[in-house]
Amino acid sequence: MEQKQMQENSYDESQIQVLEGLEAVRKRPGMYIGSTSGKGLHHLVWEIVDNSIDEALAGYCDEINVSIEEDNSIRVTDNGRGIPVGIQEKMGRPAVEVIMTVLHAGGKFGGGGYKVSGGLHGVGASVVNALSTELEVFVHREGKIHYQKYERGIPVADLKVIGDTDQTGTITRFKPDPEIFQETTVYEFDTLATRMRELAFLNRNIKLTIEDKREHKQKKEFHYEGGIKSYVEHLNRSKQPIHEEPVYVEGSKDGIQVEVSLQYNEGYTNNIYSFTNNIHTYEGGTHEVGFKTALTRVINDYGRKNSILKDADSNLTGEDVREGLTAIVSIKHPNPQFEGQTKTKLGNSEARTITESVFSEAFEKFLLENPNVARKIVEKGTMAARARVAAKKARELTRRKSALEVSSLPGKLADCSSKDPAISEIYIVEGDSAGGSAKQGRDRHFQAILPLKGKIINVEKARLDKILSNDEVRTIITAIGTNIGGDFDIEKARYHKVIIMTDADVDGAHIRTLLLTFFYRYMRQIIEHGYIYIAQPPLFKVQQGKKIQYAYNEKELEKILAELPAQPKPGIQRYKGLGEMNPTQLWETTMDPEVRSLLQVSLQDAIEADETFEILMGDKVEPRRNFIQENAKYVKNLDI
């Protein structure tokens, strides 16, 4: 890129500040990258990419490439100014070496180097270096290529010049240390691509490329001129928008930049995603509160002034005006304060005021200029308000006065005797016959059984009042005890294991998906707390004489058959449904904690989960067809 703003805002070794040493990182890596699981492994990539993004935010870089090399190392290349290579005064070493070997050294702490920076907690390159068996850095700067190599954070040799160049930028290649990342050191292309796409949406001037050079070669390029406006269109691509063009707002005040884009659709759920300096603020925060407050106020004001809301009508609540809303709120803040359980909640009070004023002014203008769209938005809110009132009545009917009242449920729930949620589990079972076997086979002390008669309602296509009129949904809500939506309380969960047990056929998979959609939309916290599990009943029963063995997949079946003597010929039964097993078999294979296998449902990426549920369970056929075609190659067992 051309040398813009260089004089007024130099970035050299004098900008690099040093805060503390590196020894602790290898001892307690979780403190610096969250965990040493696959999540922490991928976090290493973002620490390096975030440094390149900082260069882009400062206006010096417009291309970032990430490649997974054949040896599973990662190479990150940018065309920024290149990390400074001059001697850093305090340490007496080249600035690039200080950045790579000293914790909390970098240009993002003083304010002179970068006005706004992303890198989570600014731990940066030194942590990646400490947790890698080897790291190489190539700096293209001032006409020379500077090179240094490190092993587990320690320089192998001094920084040296290895050639001439007419370009600027930094190339970092690192290989994660298997001593630290014992679970896995294998990078997932899709995980990296998802975040690269998100960064491209959030930073409209950057072209990001991700390439996999391993066996299954693939490459993706992301560059969105529309920025977060394109992001909203992407998120709504499988929905029916109420207005064609997403609303886009930007403004800044006191060094804080605010961008908001939103679009309403015909659906009933809302998806608001907020970001600060490219970090997804999962727990929301002041910027999100400012946006929601402005949205509710502006829509109510417009509805009143234009007599869409009558004098006798109550004001629409935030919940009402957010029905069917997809929105991105992205701010760039020079000094963000993060709080909350996972440090993903913005705490700066000024971010609320600035977001509120920037957004409300522009959104008022949008409604005035688009009266037809404005009317649709207000009317959608009034419909949601009616449904909310109806749902409240329905909810009051289902609300139990005490945990003991479950016994009065009409013969559905066979509860356990334990009242300790930490050891109690509930099996949600498909069909009465399987429910009967499960009731007889269970351990009554800690296992409760809830049989479902049929398929529960598809919550993706219905408003809350309709959902709450569904018997199966009401029974599930009452049995689990947490309530739903705004009244949800995780402390009231009666079981810390909610186990979905369905047949291993297409119908079973559909029921499982309907249940997961319901839990995701209305009880998301029980997924986030790790309370939802999927039972794994066996697919095959192998009997030879009196000896019976169970196989949970084709591979296990092959292994069992290979180990059995040829005579007498073993009998193989393929289970189509849970009802084919007697109570003892169901206990031995699927319910006994000593031998059973359970899949825990986790939520890695809320945005991706949201898209997937919308594609699979929403109204539009085309996105669903595309999803099936793209994922068909991963299907192992097809039940036709």
From Swiss-Prot:
Domain Toprim: 424-538
GO molecular function, one term: DNA binding
Enzyme class, spelled out: isomerase
SMART domains: HATPase_c (SM00387), TOP2c (SM00433)
One Pfam family in the UniProt entry: HATPase_c
Annotated InterPro entries: DNA_gyrase_B_C, GyrB, HATPase_C_sf, Ribosomal_Su5_D2-typ_SF, Ribsml_uS5_D2-typ_fold_subgr, Topo_IIA, Topo_IIA-like_dom_sf, Topo_IIA_B
Claim: Cytoplasm is one of the keywords in the record: yes
Keyword terms, alphabetized: ATP-binding, Cytoplasm, DNA-binding, Isomerase, Magnesium, Metal-binding, Nucleotide-binding, Topoisomerase
Gene Ontology CC terms: chromosome; cytoplasm
Catalysis: reaction(s): ATP-dependent breakage, passage and rejoining of double-stranded DNA
Residues the record lists as binding Mg(2+) 2: 503, 505
GO BP terms: DNA topological change; DNA-templated DNA replication
Miscellaneous comment text of the record: Few gyrases are as efficient as E.coli at forming negative supercoils. Not all organisms have 2 type II topoisomerases; in organisms with a single type II topoisomerase this enzyme also has to decatenate newly replicated chromosomes.
The protein, known as: DNA gyrase subunit B
Organism annotation: Bacillus anthracis
